[in-house]
Amino acid sequence: MFDVLMYLFETYIHTEAELRVDQDKLEQDLTDAGFDREDIYNALLWLEKLADYQEGLTEPMQLASDPLSMRIYTPEECERLDASCRGFLLFLEQIQVLNLEIREMVIERVLALDTAEFDLEDLKWVILMVLFNIPGCENAYQQMEELLFEVNEGMLH
C-alpha cells in the first residue's frame, strides 16, 4: 500500500500533474503499473481520509499547547514509530514545521498504513503528504521538502 502512495505522490501530486483524474482510470493505471488491487484500494482510501482533513470533514484533535507538556506515545504508536521517528517528529515541532494538530494527523495517518515495516524515510514522506493536503501549510511543506531532499542528496555523494 505504501508503494502505491509513493507512486501516486511522485507521479500525480509532487510533479503537479493533472490532479483531477478519473478514479477508474487511475485504478487501471495503477493495475497496469503492477500494483495489487487491494493495495490500490487501501491507498485510495488512505488518501480519501487524508483529504477529509483538507475539506474539514475530519477535525484534528484539539490540544492544549503548554510548552512544558510532552507527547506520550501509546504502545501501538511506539511499535510503528521507533525512537528515531518520534525524535524526528519532536524536532519538526521544535523548528515549527509541525504544530500539535498536524503532528496528530501525521501519527493517525501513519497508524492507518497497512504496512509491516516503517522507518524514518517513510515517515518523512507521510509528513510531506499530510502537509501537502493542508491549506496554509505551504511554508511547512517547503521546509519539509528541503529537509527530505537535502538529506537524500547528501547521501548520494
From Swiss-Prot:
- Superkingdom is Bacteria
What Pfam families does the record tag this protein with? Answer: DUF494
Task: Return the PANTHER family for the record.
Answer: PROTEIN SMG (PTHR38692:SF1)
UniProt similarity note: Belongs to the Smg family.
Q: What is this protein called?
A: Protein Smg
Q: Which organism is it from?
A: Shigella boydii serotype 18 (strain CDC 3083-94 / BS512)
